Regions:
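Alpha-helical transmembrane segments and their membrane-interface junctions
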Residues: 119-140, 204-214
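Short hydrophobic alpha-helical segments enriched in small aliphatic residues
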Residues: 3-6
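Alpha-helical membrane-embedded segments
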Residues: 147-168, 187
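Helix-coil boundary and interhelical linker segments in multi-pass alpha-helical membrane proteins
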Residues: 54-69, 125-150
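Hydrophobic alpha-helical membrane-embedded segments
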Residues: 61-86, 158-170
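C-terminal halves and exits of single transmembrane alpha-helices
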Residues: 109-133, 192-199
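Membrane-proximal soluble regions of multi-pass membrane proteins
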Residues: 14-32, 83-107, 165-219
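Membrane interfacial helix-start motif at the N-side
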Residues: 26-56, 101-117
Length: 219
């Protein structure tokens, strides 16, 4: 009975949905093998993923606090792993130079991340200098941090939408949707594949023994 149900499900699965999920898996695998070889980086991504899951839950309570958690904990730990610990230079595992990996990066490569982080760092200063952001917003009753959280939330949503629309023209709407889905589901996926990384790091394993063509196990 179960086999029959699985067969029916497989035959009735939308080709469009299958194509979308294949793209998501391709993006996930390329992201892992190219940019997450260091166990320290993986561990920081685990911390980041957990904080983003907390931020997701806090969206229902207070979106401003959710954004503060996501940016100050999630993004700081995530990008620290990339900037300070992930190997740069020639990638022996995948046979690719750092310049090549930066050029083919679907989402935010280091140059685009630098621009995004620059805006993120500038917003607190701008809001401090002008609580009304030079007439663009009305200061809320929640105070400086609450307004900052809402601005950072707008920045995060805007960054996701901007790159998604950009990818519609660079690649296709399907790739844009796949990237957006991959980004939004990254916290769940990162927990699934990186929960072992702290234990591997404690054993002295600094680099993940990644094999080209083999995706990481999630359980």
């Amino acid at each position: 009975m179960h086999a029959r149900h699985a067969a029916v499900t497989a035959t009735t699965e939308s080709p469009c949905m299958a194509s979308l999920m294949n793209r998501v898996e391709t993006l996930r695998w390329d992201d892992h093998r190219y940019y997450h070889q260091c166990r320290i980086n993986q561990t920081l991504h685990l911390v980041s993923a957990i904080s983003f899951l907390v931020a997701y839950a806090w969206l229902l309570i207070d979106p401003a606090v959710s954004a503060l958690i996501g940016w100050c904990v999630g993004m700081v730990t995530r990008q620290s792993g990339h900037i300070f610990f992930e190997p740069r230079g020639y990638d022996q595992v995948n046979g690719a130079s750092d310049a090549h990996k930066e050029a083919i990066k679907v989402g935010y490569n280091m140059r685009r991340k630098a621009l995004l982080i620059g805006v993120w760092l500038a917003l607190p200063l701008l809001l401090w200098a002008s609580p009304g952001l030079f007439g663009l917003i009305t200061p809320g009753a929640g105070g400086y941090l609450h307004d900052l959280g809402l601005l950072w939330l707008a920045l995060g949503v805007g960054g996701l939408l901007f790159r998604s629309v950009h990818l519609c023209f660079l690649r296709s709407p399907m790739w844009a949707l796949a990237w957006a889905l991959k980004i939004l589901s990254d916290p769940f996926h990162n927990v699934a594949i990186y929960w072992r990384s702290p234990f591997a790091l404690l054993r002295g394993e600094r680099l993940d023994p990644i094999e080209a063509g083999h995706a990481p196990r999630s359980a």
